[in-house]
Amino acid sequence: MLGLIKETIDRLRYKIPLRPRQIQIEITNRCNMDCPMCQREDLGIELEHMSWTHFATVVDKLGQRENITLTGWGEPFIHPRVFDMIAYCKERGHKVMVTSNGLFTKPSMVDDILNSAVDTITFSIDSVNGNETVTDGHTSNKVYENIEAVVKGRKPGTLGVRLQATLHANCDNDLYDVIRYGARIGCDIINVGRLDRQFRPNLERPDAQQERSIFLKADEIARSCGIQLDWLQ
């Protein structure tokens, strides 16, 4: 608690810490989804997996006990060595978090996750009503099944599971449903972020007044459901 208070005071004073609190490594920018808000195709970069040599070089430069998140514009679990990467980080004393779309490419993925030493997995999900944009014949029902299997299969006190939603205009009820869904299946935290419209100006997000109303109601729902709600931006 004292550390949190000090961190808050330092932020208010614009005091920059000597080291980052969290390190993000994009191990791939390839993905098995094509979400309309994703900027992956707009960046003009080659879509590829990070090599093992490059990954190990980055991790070896880090100090001890860092918070490492394996995420980026791609889906980490399609990287052929993702579990080797998780193990490599854990062997060096780091905490490891992964952000995933939940659309696993092989049946063994749930067990592979549960048998790995990953500390936290965050599933990006904007709706539980079938509104996700998926490709290649996949259905969003499979995403829900995978999320629920991970939550149900974890051992107490081990893997943390979060849901992360992006707030879109006129989709506040979808957010409320995600909060209720996460609480019902036993997730730990719901993260909510604003929609980035830099490359997608046609997409809409709530204005400031609408956001405030949504925030207040979402907080009320989260409290009533007994689940933590974090606003990322």
Descriptions of predicted regions:
Residues 26, 48-53, 92, 111-233:
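Radical SAM enzyme [4Fe-4S]-AdoMet core and its adjacent flexible, acidic
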Residues 1-120, 134, 141, 201-222:
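Conserved alpha-helical substructure of the radical SAM core
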